[in-house]
From Swiss-Prot:
Protein known as: Microtubule-associated protein VP6
Native species: Aedes pseudoscutellaris reovirus (isolate France)
Function summary: Minor inner capsid component. Displays NTPase and RNA 5'-triphosphatase (RTPase) activities. May function as a cofactor of polymerase VP2. Associates with microtubules and plays a role in the formation, structural organization and morphology of viral inclusions, where the assembly of cores and the replication of viral RNA occur.
Localization per record: Virion; Host cytoplasm, Host cytoskeleton
Disulfide bonds: none
Main location: virion
Length: 540
């Protein structure tokens, strides 16, 4: 039973929670809900009686635990205890040395009320609890709205506390996930615009107006600000104000280091922002700078930092104790920062891991397919599956991935040629949904047919890895489904950075249309099924 009734929808909506339609609850959950509401009604009626709810706390505790109401014999007055008529008429309520309620005026009427309500606690061993628990959300706003007759029962009822963090109510909680809708974060690429990153300027969190900041740091009038604040604890991101395009990033690190960067551009500090910025599931605090609604993503508010830290520690332990090739897969959207993360790993390594680290680019397989499509000798093609070759072709922009070429060919079938015009934001915004759907369907059909060969590619790569006992192989992928073909491992991560993929793609100097379509397709194929890996959790 939730401490606040679901009819108080404004309380739950304030916390970002919206009730599932009761008729859509699964049968067991529906039974639990109906029992809880019946108990709530009993409590409401008892609270209106003489003496209020405090006299009746133990009585309510009993029925919430599935017991019939009972009365302690020793607590009865001498007169009542020896009243023959009373004992015969109310014997069903009395049990010698019971743990029931003490006698008070009106207790027998209360017991009659409970029995007449036909309240039955559902009890399916191993499936439904043997007692009805009080569900409380650990949030000041929620706690202060708990009705007084429920609040007074918290010390006698079995209580389940729902965690609340900076990201909101824990959606992983079993009671929250049963009764409330799963929230989504909404984005819209129709309102995007390309951003000149040389005009995006870092400023410290300040109350100064835009004009004052421009004057203080001698900036151009068209400068775009990104506020930042160094923190030791999680802070709530600020919102836009006064119609200006204003963003807020939460940073980790030494405040003096970041003070030195005030007035410098986002572009000049991109790598450090990427490493130390803490991604949040809030549209105004990621680095996309102009959008509304159309891209829908499931929001996760689980504590990413704790789960990720545990998994990274497990990886470090494997690298120390195992004498075989250790494999990790990192899944990230087109434009999410996979290449930047790979560059960081190659340059800085991973703290706590002394093994040689080899990173395989997410486009490596697609470019190898392009490189070998005209080679008849399969052995010659297999010889090109080696770390050095894959590294070189991944860096070579002149090699078009097999998958990118497929999109180009499909666009041509719709009479769309790649040009400066079709790569423009104006054209992308007007691209028909039917064309996107048709290309997406054919891409998935091709991808499925190609799946076996992709698996053989990674199998050969792992089987011919030099010095496997001292190597950590990190494979970057575009979508969750690719993990079935990629090197087998239980170390799968979903990349989560401060960059918003669509904005990153629209700011690219080449392949904007093709990458936009691939972004949409891979997003449909899934990218967020695994533990979220944030750069700020790797390099603290």
């Amino acid at each position: 039973m939730f401490a606040i009734p679901f009819t108080a929808s404004q309380v739950y909506s304030h916390l970002g929670l919206y009730l599932q339609p009761i008729e859509k609850l699964d049968p067991l959950t529906k039974v639990q809900y109906e029992s809880a509401e019946k108990l709530r009604d009993i409590i409401a009626q008892l609270s209106r009686r003489s003496g209020g709810i405090s006299l009746r706390k133990n009585l309510i505790r009993d029925i919430a635990c599935g017991h019939k109401p009972k009365l302690n014999i020793p607590s009865l007055t001498h007169q009542v205890r020896h009243n023959r008529e009373f004992k015969h008429g109310r014997s069903q309520f009395i049990l010698v040395d019971s743990n029931g309620s003490d006698y008070y005026d009106g207790i027998f009427d209360d017991m009659v009320l409970i029995l007449q309500s036909n309240f039955v606690l559902p009890n399916v061993p191993g499936i439904i609890s043997e007692q009805l628990r009080l569900i409380v959300i650990d949030n000041d706003f929620y706690l202060k709205h708990i009705p007084s007759e429920i609040a007074i029962l918290r010390d006698v009822l079995s209580e389940h506390m729902v965690k609340f963090s900076i990201d909101g109510v824990s959606l992983e909680d079993p009671f929250i996930s049963k009764f409330f809708r799963k929230p989504f974060v909404l984005y819209d690429h129709t309102k995007f615009k390309k951003i000149d990153l040389t005009k995006v300027v870092l400023i410290n969190k300040t109350g100064k107006s835009k004009a004052q900041v421009i004057d203080k740091y001698k900036l151009n009038d068209d400068a775009v600000f990104i506020n930042y604040e160094v923190f030791d604890v999680m802070l709530q991101p600020t919102k836009r104000r006064d119609g200006d395009i204003e963003q807020f990033i939460r940073m980790r690190g030494d405040i003096e280091t970041w003070k030195a960067k005030i007035g410098t551009t986002f572009e000049d500090n991109l790598l450090e922002l990427f490493v130390h910025g803490v991604p949040v599931m809030n549209s105004t605090s990621q680095l996309q700078l102009d959008f509304q609604i159309s891209d829908i993503r499931v929001a996760s508010v689980f504590d990413d930092q704790i789960v990720c830290a545990s998994k990274l520690n497990s990886l470090r332990e494997q690298c120390l104790t195992e004498s075989s090739l250790i494999r990790v897969n990192i899944i990230g959207q087109k434009g999410s920062g996979k290449s930047m993360l790979m560059k960081l790993i190659n340059e800085r390594g991973i703290p706590g891991i002394s093994r040689r680290i080899i990173c395989i680019d997410s486009d490596a397989y697609g470019k190898w397919r392009t490189q070998t499509q005209y080679i008849d000798n399969k052995f010659e093609a297999l010889k090109l599956i080696n770390v050095d070759n894959l590294y070189e072709i991944a860096r070579d922009d002149s090699v078009v991935s097999f998958y990118e070429q497929f999109i180009i060919d499909q666009l041509l079938s719709h009479n769309i040629e790649i040009s400066e015009h079709t790569n423009s934001l104006r054209f992308i915004k007007q691209l028909k949904v039917d064309i996107l759907k048709d290309i997406g369907r054919k891409f998935k059909e091709m991808y499925l047919a190609d799946f076996k060969e992709q698996g053989q590619f990674y199998e050969y790569l792992c089987g011919n890895m030099p010095e496997p006992s001292n190597t950590l192989l990190i494979t970057f992928l575009h979508a969750t489904v690719e993990t079935s073909a990629a090197p087998g491992t239980n170390m799968n991560f979903s990349l989560n950075t401060i960059l918003y993929p669509l904005q990153s793609i629209l700011n690219r100097k080449r392949g904007t249309l093709v990458n936009f379509i691939l972004n949409r397709i891979y997003d449909e194929m899934g990218t967020e099924a695994f533990t979220r890996l944030r750069p700020c959790d790797v390099w603290k």
